């Protein structure tokens, strides 16, 4: 008798567990659905890798996309041209100030406009900044060498 009641209890418990399972028809939550209202042309995203030059990449991206907005053709401007001349001017100023200012990698978006006004601008194909067999920008060694040299 005890075995039968234990068996019936176990069977009823299992049937409740089986009936408590979710059905396949349960609603699946959807993620956000975005609707394009207006699609603007943009230049492709570029990889700065490990160069500490996000300021140059973002400033150049701003200029390239603004040219597209104005109806000009797409152009790929050189980020490393800006970095080169910005670092050169920083080094000259650092020496003139007898080391009494900050000299390190990095900069600001305003540096892009400064270099553009003073030195002009060139396309990426003219000056890509990769001259030692590397396929991406890695400025850790450059930053250390330039700092010790200056």
Regions found by a protein language model. Give the residues of each.
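Bacterial Sec-dependent N-terminal signal peptides
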Residues: 1-23
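Catalytic-core signature of thiol
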Residues: 23-150
